[in-house]
Amino acid sequence: MMYSCRERRMITVKWSLCLIFCLSNSILVFAKHLCLPDQRDSLWGFKNEFHVPSEKWRNNTDCCSWDGVSCDPKTGNVVGLDLAGSDLNGPLRSNSSLFRLQHLQKLYLGCNTSFGSLSYNDGLKGGELLDSIGNLKYLKVLSLRGCNLFGKIPSSLGNLSYLTHLDLSFNDFTGVIPDSMGNLNYLRVLNLGKCNFYGKVPSSLGNLSYLAQLDLSYNDFTREGPDSMGNLNRLTDMLLKLNSLTDIDLGSNQLKGMLPSNMSSLSKLEYFYIGGNSFSGSIPSSLFMIPSLVELDLQRNHFSALEIGNISSQSKLQVLILGGNNFNPDIVDLSIFSPLLSLGYLDVSGINLKISSTVSLPSPIEYLVLSSCNISEFPKFLRNQTKLYSLDISANQIEGQVPEWLWSLPELQSINISHNSFNGFEGPADVIQGGGELYMLDISSNIFQDPFPLLPVDSMNFLFSSNNRFSGEIPKTICELDNLVMLVLSNNNFSGSIPRCFENLHLYVLHLRNNNLSGIFPEEAISDRLQSLDVGHNLFSGELPKSLINCSALEFLYVEDNRISDTFPSWLELLPNFQILVLRSNEFYGPIFSPGDSLSFPRLRIFDISENRFTGVLPSDYFAPWSAMSSVVDRIIQHFFQGYYHNSVVLTNKGLNMELVGSGFTIYKTIDVSGNRLEGDIPESISLLKELIVLNMSNNAFTGHIPPSLSNLSNLQSLDLSQNRLSGSIPGELGELTFLARMNFSYNRLEGPIPQTTQIQTQDSSSFTENPGLCGLPLKKNCGGKEEATKQEQDEEKEEEEQVFSWIAAAIGYVPGVVCGLTIGHILVSHKRDWFMRIVSLFT
């Protein structure tokens, strides 16, 4: 088709207009998605305050495309910021440019641990931060989980009236939850777990009618005070009002009381966790009538009875944990749980069970805990549990051999049969190797004896076989367990040396305590992953393996009662997580401090070097860097194997041996340097260790005075300074230590009266004997008899007489002195000074 010139021009114009229109639309659309300049500037300022680890945060690009940034497509305002777990570096301050983003609706800053990290100077008070966040009035979602925030929650947080999700868990706040939290009318999720809150929880939380998930776990809520949520009536009244709740977690507080019988009114409840409290009475049957309930955790309380009632076959309950309560001795038939057809996890430990031969549990059950259930026969119904993954039948009265069919269960991977009376295994020597993917086996505290069982080579991670009767050398077949990370063979009769093939293992935990093992501990047997080494009460000789210095995660070293001959292992200070050192009863020698040593053990909790041959003087600042003993707040490292096994150590407190297991290490802090040859003054810096519970410096050669500053050790329960060469008096300030139950100052050179304070006077007289100069109760020696008292009275009378004569003499000399003074004054002022001075000069 042919077009005229005019038509061609018209077509060109039309196409040009169309192109311009399209381009203008594109430009408008492009411009529409650019965030506003003030929003970009605020974000860029925030980036400059921290190191935001993203290459997309560039100043010449659309900030709405930056990682973690969401914008309103209509206004260009930033409405969402998600930088959770971004390793933001630096304290978030209350004047941060972040708070200029006034249109924010979602803010995720969780797991950035530097926000309130060090102190009130270079960190951030959580209260200040939340006060600033309280001005972001459009916020709907706020997550500051695990940011190391501290301080008090401000009431301004209640200004966030649009908030639906609030997560402040895993921080270090103080005080109580503010009443204003009840103003968050649209709140659906409230997570305040592990925040160190205490006391009253506001009843205003009962106003949160939309609340679906409530987590107040791992705090310190009690029933103290008339308005406290710890008062169970208040607690349940508030909870029962919130009929939208699906998740309730009140675990690990100090709540007390009884659960109400009408718990079924929480008809939407799916998850109910109250473990680790002090609830008592009966577990009401109404809990099992909630049709939506999926998980129920009531462990570690004081419940005494269980009311199951009629359980609907429509029950959705999958997890039921009842262990660790104080159930009465009435026998409960295991078959009452049979109607729970969806049950996959059942813990009934501590309940006196009847298990009939015909009992059957739901086939989907995967985790079964029957510990301490007074079972005397291996449960035969387990043979049909083809989905069983983990079995715990520890602490019962089962005798005989472990049945062969147990190892044929196809899904079984974790078995705990400890604390029974098993004496062997049915079937061939390799019967356990037929157990598929078995990764955890605990056969401790039985009466097993040789031969040691053959184990699955590829899957075994955790092996516990302590407190049995195994003997001979440690079997080299253990070295074939390539994936083994925990090996506990304590309290057997193993002898010989540690197999050198242990170098093939990558152990985190190696415990061989109380055997008859001997020889030099091989350097190559130390895995650089080692966190806990316990070889106490054996016959090892030689030196400590220096390869321990490569174990950067080492926390626990226990070598008590061996024949190890070495100098003090000061190189252990290089291990950043080191906490427990027990060298007691060996042949260590020499000084425990040398010039140039810093001996900075910031995390050390237990220091026991007693009964060795250490010598030398400790400088006054020796204990200054030991910060874990001077502060309550101290990070506790969590391990992937936590729950499988706990370290233990035997210590002396108040004259008695006591065993610390597991969490006892977090609160128990002790120093024992007794039975050595240390000398010089007791270091003043020891008074900085305010969390110290036991201090034993007895049977050394310490001299000088007892530091009065020991009265700063406000948590001290036991003090032993006996059998030294200490002189001077017993400081009366020690009587201010209200927890000090035992003290011993005997066999020193102390003198003077024993302080007459309650804490000191309650001690036995043997705590003060063999100090010739000490007197007063509880010793029979009085501080001065009758003759001495008479002499003292005579001295006082003589002193009084001398004072009287002095005053008389002063009075006699007073009058002529005044006359003489007046005469001399008259001479001086009457211009006869030269004559007077000439006369004076004749006598000088």
UniProtKB/Swiss-Prot annotation:
Q: Which InterPro entries match?
A: Leu-rich_rpt, Leu-rich_rpt_typical-subtyp, LRR_dom_sf, LRR_N_plant-typ, LRR_R13L4/SHOC2-like
Residues that carry a glycan: 59, 95, 112, 159, 207, 262, 310, 374, 384, 416, 493, 516, 550, 696, 712, 744
An example Gene Ontology CC term for this record: plasma membrane
Q: Which UniProt keywords apply?
A: Cell membrane, Glycoprotein, Leucine-rich repeat, Membrane, Receptor, Repeat, Signal, Transmembrane, Transmembrane helix
**LRR repeat locations:** 102-126, 136-160, 161-183, 185-208, 209-231, 242-265, 266-290, 292-313, 315-339, 345-362, 363-385, 386-409, 410-434, 436-457, 458-481, 482-504, 506-527, 528-551, 553-574, 575-601, 602-625, 665-689, 690-713, 714-737, 739-762
What does the sequence similarity comment in the record state about its family? Answer: Belongs to the RLP family.
Tell me the leader sequence span: 1-31
Q: Which residues lie on this side of the membrane: Extracellular?
A: 32-803
- Tell whether Zinc is among the UniProt keywords: no
The entry's protein name is Receptor-like protein 49
Q: Which Pfam families match?
A: LRR_1, LRR_14, LRR_8, LRRNT_2
Which stretches are transmembrane?
804-824
For whether the record's keyword set contains Transmembrane, the answer is: yes
Species this protein is from: Arabidopsis thaliana
Can you tell which superkingdom this protein's organism belongs to?
Eukaryota
Q: Topology with regard to the membrane?
A: Single-pass type I membrane protein
Q: Which ranges sit in the Cytoplasmic compartment? A: 825-844
Q: Report the Gene3D superfamilies cross-referenced here.
A: Ribonuclease Inhibitor
Location relative to the cell: Cell membrane
